[in-house]
């Protein structure tokens, strides 16, 4: 009896392949602009394990595909609307990376506020000598009012970690969260006007495109701090670089960018920006857990008839 065929377009965490190879036939193909598959092979594919985009046109080439397991909590690269129309279940990897991303958000906030990377670079350059000291950091976390743009699973973990710092916490989402005591603002502009620190942790959707623009940055003000661990899609990078250069915004800490891995030169230049190469979930334990969830979703689908973590748009409800 032939094994179920799973398509893997491009690279994916090696642990996913290790978990699946003894149960399924792995059809690994290079990632290219188009999906070049022999018709016979395409007709045997019943599942996809993917890290990155998977457009609707590719789904149309796979008449028997049932489930697409996405490596990552964000799944904006997968055409879920088209998948739903075709009855294809899409899964992601929520929860297993919440702690890591939340920890990174706090670390990035502290590094940005206290200029810790610059202080370390100053020391490594041999500048710490008798009679010298690194200049006082302009900002402190003490007494800040932090606004969370997004209060999903990760946003809530960030908020929990902020509480011991004794900062005031507020948030903006599409609707108020029941059972949450933080102040709620129905608009992002209202939140930005009220706070001096904004942490963005929202997904890539048409509604979040460049919502953090010049107007929002101006509302945060010259003492304002922006931290983004969500999606670069949400920030107008030209407006941000201009605000950092002019002093209209105090500082920014970014783990994500609009067109990764490209980082605009105007963001590399300001000394009041702390930049990371999208590493919020990038630890061995967390990536292993994400890989396990990709594999477990596929195994559960074919052995029990239900995925573990289907996305909301999927034909199978969580």
Residue ranges of model-derived segments:
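An N-terminal-biased, well-structured beta-alpha scaffold segment characteristic
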Residues: 1-91, 193, 213-218
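C-terminal helix-to-coil terminal segments
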Residues: 3, 84, 91-103, 131, ...
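Phosphate-coordination loops involved in phosphoryl transfer and adenosine-cofactor binding
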Residues: 3, 65, 142-145, 223
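Conserved beta-strand positions in the Rossmann-like core of class I SAM-dependent methyltransferases
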Residues: 27, 170, 233
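Rossmann-like adenosine-cofactor binding region
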Residues: 56, 175-266
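Phosphate-binding beta-alpha-beta segment of Rossmann-like dinucleotide-binding domains, i.e.
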Residues: 86, 94-145, 157
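Glycine-rich Rossmann-fold phosphate-binding loop(s) that bind the pyrophosphate
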Residues: 151-152
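NAD(P)-binding Rossmann-fold cofactor-contacting core
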Residues: 164-180
């Amino acid at each position: 009896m032939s094994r179920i065929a799973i398509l893997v377009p491009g690279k994916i965490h090696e642990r996913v392949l290790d978990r699946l190879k003894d149960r399924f036939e792995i059809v690994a193909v290079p990632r290219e602009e188009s999906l070049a598959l022999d018709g016979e092979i395409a007709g045997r594919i019943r599942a996809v394990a993917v890290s990155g985009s998977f457009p609707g046109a590719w789904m149309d080439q796979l008449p028997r595909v049932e489930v697409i397991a996405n490596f990552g909590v964000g799944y904006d690269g997968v055409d879920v609307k088209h998948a739903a129309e075709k009855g294809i279940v899409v899964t992601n990897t929520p929860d297993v990376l919440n702690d890591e991303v939340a920890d990174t958000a706090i670390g990035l906030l502290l590094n940005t506020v206290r200029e810790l990377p610059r202080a370390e670079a100053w020391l490594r350059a041999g500048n710490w000598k008798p009679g010298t000291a690194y200049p006082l950091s302009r900002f402190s976390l003490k007494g800040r009012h932090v606004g969370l743009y997004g209060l999903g699973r990760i946003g809530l973990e960030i908020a929990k970690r902020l509480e011991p710092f004794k900062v005031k916490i507020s948030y903006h989402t599409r609707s108020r969260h029941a059972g949450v005591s933080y102040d709620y603002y129905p608009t992002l502009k209202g939140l930005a006007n009220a706070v001096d620190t904004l942490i963005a942790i929202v997904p890539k959707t048409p509604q979040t495109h460049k919502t953090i623009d010049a107007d929002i940055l101006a509302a945060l003000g010259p003492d304002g701090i922006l931290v983004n661990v969500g999606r670069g899609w949400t920030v107008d990078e030209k407006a941000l670089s201009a605000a950092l250069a002019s002093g209209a915004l105090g500082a920014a800490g970014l783990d994500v960018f609009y067109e990764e891995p490209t980082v605009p030169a105007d963001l590399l230049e300001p000394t009041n920006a702390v930049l990371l190469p999208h590493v919020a979930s990038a630890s061995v334990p967390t990536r292993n857990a994400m890989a396990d969830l990709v594999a477990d979703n596929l195994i559960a689908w074919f052995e029990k008839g239900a995925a573990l973590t289907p996305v909301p748009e999927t034909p199978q409800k969580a």
